[in-house]
């Protein structure tokens, strides 16, 4: 019967939603539904007893019966009030549990995704789907429970009172039904289309706020305030217009229902007068019927509007499932084992690799990163340096071939054990909102304060930290906005120090720093890389002179490799890059 209230395209969506969520909250919904049945029965009883109220006071004028009826009315409304309270409490409990469950499930799914996923879903869209769309799940289920079960029970009970007492009047009242159904169906289709556009506009607002916040220096430097203001004004205006359109469409059901109900009530009053005056019906029966009819109006109106509200909320549910059903590209084998301890030799063997656009980057790539040695990756942009790092960290899998650590294929080991063996410092330093101590401690869970301080000292970060207002408890702001570039970089190095990993990866760790900061960070890196397998991506060749081995990438292939002295003695790619960067121009 519920399927009659929604479009065919949404029926399977609703059934899936109920199957996945309703059963987990069955005890709470069971109590709530039981309370709704009590409310429906008491509502019907309040209409039924109006017959005795009128007949005992107007017809029989029996004072004892009047007092008895008064006590019964008080009991009816007390029971109804208590049942309504219980219903509200357990509906809220179940609804809040559903939101929490949905958000945890979506966030876990997002965490398991590979990097390509984030090019499809920008952060603003993820925020909408984790908040608004999770709320939509609760809204749909509560609509089903309250508007369908509660209102349907109440309507059925009141209709029973009406039919038992006055079948003919009940038939007159039902004559308005087809008109109401047709009007609501037209409104529903319009609401669904506008709701999809409104949700997209909300995502644009969130994205604009994020971009303005994270790029505030660029906004100020290029005097983009007016541009950002105009863009935000457009997005807000779009949401406002669409919200107003939805409000108008939803409100349009009220005049439809009010007008049709007015005709029904007018017809009932006219016909009931004839029945009382000419056929001897008691005034109590008439009053009871009209009371039931008036009480039935509200649940009938809510049921009529339910389709509009349900279709609107299901737009958010559909978007939530689009995210929840997005396939996970990188998965861990059931037979995956923890990566055993070892020296940390990394080997690429006959690796073919391409990104989603289909253009092949590596073709039969073979390269080895010796254990305990520092290897520099150099070459022009687009040569594949960062892609090698992505494969080592298993952010992607090769199409063909294998990447191994100490002879273990990365596909055969667990994600956690692999990444626990790797310390990473990137060019684009990222700090989480929180304190300096918190950001360093992310390098290793459970690290003591002494270990955190020692890591900071090794990274040449301790001195500047102690000059901060609250030392290690100083808040860094969103993405470390309160710190300089060099300070942020040294904190990320301290984080890698604390990890104490056998494999270290540095992706242009000093490229954007001033000379003093670069010297301090180079000193920190020299201490950190001792006796560890280290891979350094560098565009500035001055940073790789001390590397044990230099791998020169060009066009997705290893063009040449060896220590710097040997590469400079050859007339190759490295020598050409070296002369361009480090030798004075003629």
From Swiss-Prot:
- By its UniProt entry, which Pfam families does this protein fall under? ABC_membrane (PF00664), ABC_tran (PF00005)
Name the record gives this protein: Uncharacterized ABC transporter ATP-binding protein y4gM
Q: How does it sit in the membrane?
A: Multi-pass membrane protein
The record's listing under SMART domains reads:
AAA (SM00382)
Q: Which GO terms describe its cellular component?
A: plasma membrane
| Location(s), subcellular | Cell membrane
InterPro entries from the UniProt entry: AAA+_ATPase (IPR003593), ABC1_TM_dom (IPR011527), ABC1_TM_sf (IPR036640), ABC_transporter-like_ATP-bd (IPR003439), ABC_transporter-like_CS (IPR017871), P-loop_NTPase (IPR027417), Type_1_exporter (IPR039421)
Bilayer-crossing residues are: 30-50, 66-86, 162-184, 256-276
Locate the residues binding ATP: 379-386
